[in-house]
Amino acid sequence: MGCVQCKDKEAAKLTEERDGSLNQSSGYRYGTDPTPQHYPSFGVTSIPNYNNFHAAGGQGLTVFGGVNSSSHTGTLRTRGGTGVTLFVALYDYEARTEDDLSFHKGEKFQILNSSEGDWWEARSLTTGETGYIPSNYVAPVDSIQAEEWYFGKLGRKDAERQLLSFGNPRGTFLIRESETTKGAYSLSIRDWDDMKGDHVKHYKIRKLDNGGYYITTRAQFETLQQLVQHYSERAAGLCCRLVVPCHKGMPRLTDLSVKTKDVWEIPRESLQLIKRLGNGQFGEVWMGTWNGNTKVAIKTLKPGTMSPESFLEEAQIMKKLKHDKLVQLYAVVSEEPIYIVTEYMSKGSLLDFLKDGEGRALKLPNLVDMAAQVAAGMAYIERMNYIHRDLRSANILVGNGLICKIADFGLARLIEDNEYTARQGAKFPIKWTAPEAALYGRFTIKSDVWSFGILLTELVTKGRVPYPGMNNREVLEQVERGYRMPCPQDCPISLHELMIHCWKKDPEERPTFEYLQGFLEDYFTATEPQYQPGENL
């Protein structure tokens, strides 16, 4: 069954490896969305450096998940000397505009122009029609990217999150790029036993010099497809045989259409407000549609909340921030009342989710995982030299599968309301704000770290207001004198120690979000090997 070499010798144990440790937390990264996608590259110099440190430059992601320092050129590789690579649809897609093509999973395309990055001009071989298609909905025919089980540049933690989703049986699996070894892959499998219950095991797939693949040298394969076929028929030393590929969620689009990619000021008439989701100090949030067919979230701001000119300038930066733990900005209406159009998150704010929703029943592992997701998004903001300024559970949105995304980043500094700009006014979130920011207006990524520590208390207390029994003035005075919130009930000491670390008086002594992400992702697994040795491999 595709096995190139099988040697009759004692099974070799796979080397236990780790991608890193808590002291090397840079190895801990969330990958892109399950289907690799191309984001046009942009230099971080286009985003003002609000912090006093230098971050690494941004890189473009190639369309199949690799890293490239420049954006996609539009040149397609050839196959068989034909000069044309055919692509196949991985999902159904319904056209949003007259420029798009609707298509069904399995439909094949000839790509006519791929210079638009996220949107390619294509001709359907089924209908003969031409139009734009989202590039992360297709893959080359017969490539591993077209396989149901291939998830590309997906991080270890996100792989576990997807495999452990409700409804996946033991033996659900996926293959992803290795985070540590270039050219290698990782096989991740959902397993179960009496001691651990449901959990995920990871096996490294190594590449031979001649192009083959193996988990153990006893069984080598010419292709990943042959490897999957082999282990689908027998466990052969794995924790169990491969039963079914993990379900891929629909890939995220970073723009509403090919036209709004560059021209994302849209007419108010193209938006329909359908259901009010929330009402805040500065406006409302609605579930709505764009063009009558695309579900979006629409934040409407009260006139006078911020200058339209300042907002548009900030939105130029916000639009460039693209990460799967940040709520994606799609478009704006910049004339008052200002409308901000973003991706829709079905479960609403984390605060409401914890207090009144499904979040009331969540246990510590789920809560720590949600904190890790927020830290991952903030680590990206940290790398891009940006600042949130208003990080709290009310500004985190929740989607299906307990996915968390950061919203409203950067907007706080634009608010012109006197009750807010006074910083000690009634509308200012004193209880979440670092003392140097509340007293002197010194907002940096380190003041965001302080706020993250407060957000951790919201998670473990299921949405309790910080500093219970104290008003804003008392909080400012007590914190300046060195007071810090005690360990909440049922909160592990180690997690409270992390909060205290976030609340160091000297901002430079607070941890980075990169460290916080690694610590929280590994909170329950720090003593386990990164890769499984296998039993009889």
UniProtKB/Swiss-Prot annotation:
Q: Which positions bear Phosphoserine?
A: 21, 26
Q: PTM per UniProt?
A: Autophosphorylated at Tyr-420. Phosphorylation on the C-terminal tail at Tyr-531 by CSK maintains the enzyme in an inactive state. PTPRC/CD45 dephosphorylates Tyr-531 leading to activation. Ultraviolet B (UVB) strongly increase phosphorylation at Thr-15 and kinase activity, and promotes translocation from the cytoplasm to the nucleus. Dephosphorylation at Tyr-420 by PTPN2 negatively regulates T-cell receptor signaling. Phosphorylated at tyrosine residues, which can be enhanced by NTN1. Palmitoylated. Palmitoylation at Cys-3 and Cys-6, probably by ZDHHC21, regulates subcellular location.
Which metal ions or organic cofactors does this protein require, according to UniProt?
A: Mn(2+)
- PANTHER family with a match to the protein in the record: TYROSINE-PROTEIN KINASE (PTHR24418)
**Which residues carry out catalysis?**
390
Q: In which tissues is it expressed?
A: Isoform 1 is highly expressed in the brain, isoform 2 is expressed in cells of hemopoietic lineages, especially T-lymphocytes.
Description of how activity is regulated? Inhibited by phosphorylation of Tyr-531 by leukocyte common antigen and activated by dephosphorylation of this site.
Return the protein name: Tyrosine-protein kinase Fyn
InterPro entries in the record: Fyn/Yrk_SH2 (IPR047924), Fyn/Yrk_SH3 (IPR035750), Kinase-like_dom_sf (IPR011009), Non-receptor_tyrosine_kinases (IPR050198), Prot_kinase_dom (IPR000719), Protein_kinase_ATP_BS (IPR017441), Ser-Thr/Tyr_kinase_cat_dom (IPR001245), SH2 (IPR000980)
Q: Keyword Cell division: yes or no?
A: no
Where, in this chain's numbering, is ATP bound?
A: 277-285, 299
Taking every annotated instance into account, which residue ranges of this chain make up the domain SH2? 149-246
Q: Which GO terms describe its molecular function?
A: alpha-tubulin binding; ATP binding; CD4 receptor binding; CD8 receptor binding; disordered domain specific binding; ephrin receptor binding; G protein-coupled receptor binding; growth factor receptor binding
Q: Which GO terms describe its cellular component?
A: actin filament; cell body; cell periphery; cytosol; dendrite; endosome; glial cell projection; glutamatergic synapse
Q: Which Pfam families match?
A: PK_Tyr_Ser-Thr, SH2, SH3_1
Q: Give the residues carrying a lipid (N-myristoyl glycine).
A: 2
Residue stretches making up the SH3 domain = 82-143
In terms of CDD domains, this protein maps to: PTKc_Fyn (cd05070), SH2_Src_Fyn_isoform_a_like (cd10418), SH3_Fyn_Yrk (cd12006)
The gene designation is Fyn
Query: Which SMART domains is this protein grouped with?
Result: SH2 (SM00252), SH3 (SM00326), TyrKc (SM00219)
